[in-house]
Design a protein with these regions (language model features):
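Short glycine-/acidic-enriched loop or helix-start segments at secondary-structure transitions
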Residues: 12-13, 60, 83, 145-147
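Cysteine-cluster motifs in flexible loop/terminal segments that predominantly coordinate metals
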Residues: 1-40
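A conserved short coil-to-beta-strand element within the FAD-binding core of flavoproteins
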Residues: 116-129, 144
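Short loop/edge segments at beta-strand edges and connector loops
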Residues: 78, 116-120, 164
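Beta1-alpha1 glycine-rich phosphate/pyrophosphate-binding loop at the start
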Residues: 50-114
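Glycine-rich dinucleotide-binding loop and its adjacent helix/turn
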Residues: 25-41, 106, 115, 143-166
Length: 166
């Protein structure tokens, strides 16, 4: 837990619970479920190219590595983390960088992983890479139209100074 309170903030709106650290939250009903246990694959090891190293790309890589696959991450920026890097730079949100740090620590402990930074790939680059599987985890952005979990409709924000981490 990084203390971001995403889980409890959804309760007030009657929305399903979610978590920045545990993407399998609310899966407790599944037999033999545990958020940290990933079964090894029963088939041969596959190779995966993950394009993007934000929270979703890193979590995908972490789980695939635990399942015994070979993972290569191509990141367009100079560091991993995606938008979390910007969010963690905001006042009071410094601990959010743990979303990235936990996953990077797990990934770096694996001998089946490679990460390439400053690597913006073209379609031919992806095709020539010859991975068994390709996963696009190319990011998300803050909305600037006022729509959010507490406000499902857009509104005019033209007369406001609207700031986002971007």
């Amino acid at each position: 837990c990084i203390g971001c309170n995403i889980c409890v903030s959804m309760d007030g709106y009657g929305l399903p619970i979610r978590c920045t650290q545990n993407p399998t939250i609310s899966e407790e009903w599944r037999r033999k479920w545990h958020p940290e246990i990933v079964s090894k694959t029963k088939k041969t090891q596959d190779s995966f190219l993950i394009i993007g190293s934000g929270p979703s790309g890193l979590e995908c890589a972490r789980v695939l590595l635990k399942a015994g696959h070979k993972v290569t991450i191509a990141e367009a920026e100079k560091e991993a983390g995606g938008r979390i890097v910007k969010e963690a730079s905001l006042p009071g949100l410094g601990e959010w960088i743990r979303v990235r740090d936990y996953r990077m620590n797990e990934i770096n402990q694996s001998s089946n992983s490679e990460i390439y930074y400053s690597s913006r790939l073209s379609a031919s680059d992806i095709k020539n890479f010859e991975a068994d599987n390709i996963i696009f985890a190319t990011g998300s952005y803050w909305r600037r139209d006022g729509v959010g979990s507490s406000n499902p409709h857009s509104c005019s924000l033209d007369h406001f100074n609207l700031y986002t981490p971007d």
